[in-house]
């Protein structure tokens, strides 16, 4: 069975996107070699990417561009090479290479995907998908990057969660740019 993981950024005050729905705050202007190497290593690890429509549109508008290849060549290469799945009821088609569009019930489709042979699956962005799949107990790993920024308001990654999901910290790593990567796995479900 394939594992389903999440790799996402949050602010110190727990927001996934700012008050305008923007995530660019997580990508600081100053390059950080240690952080870039970590991100490139994650991207080169392979797998299949899973997005919701909004994240797909953001990613598809950036990673295939010359600017992405200039700024983060290893990550751009991996993002363009890796197979991708986008869940959307409103998109008519997808144009980014190696992308499959699914319109069915999210939890049902993800259960099917996890039971198919293939690489592990990683959700990037896609807060509503993360929330729904966490509620269903379908996420095996959460890799959360706490960024050294306070947004004051925005939306959390788990908006809409109806019941608690208890996690166990597996690993934590601090980077020179102030990011703290925390790896969690589900511990038990609370009623």
Where are these regions (language model features)?
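Portal/gating segments that form or line small-molecule/metal binding sites
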Residues: 1-138, 148-191
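Extracellular, beta-strand-rich glycan-interacting domains
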Residues: 145
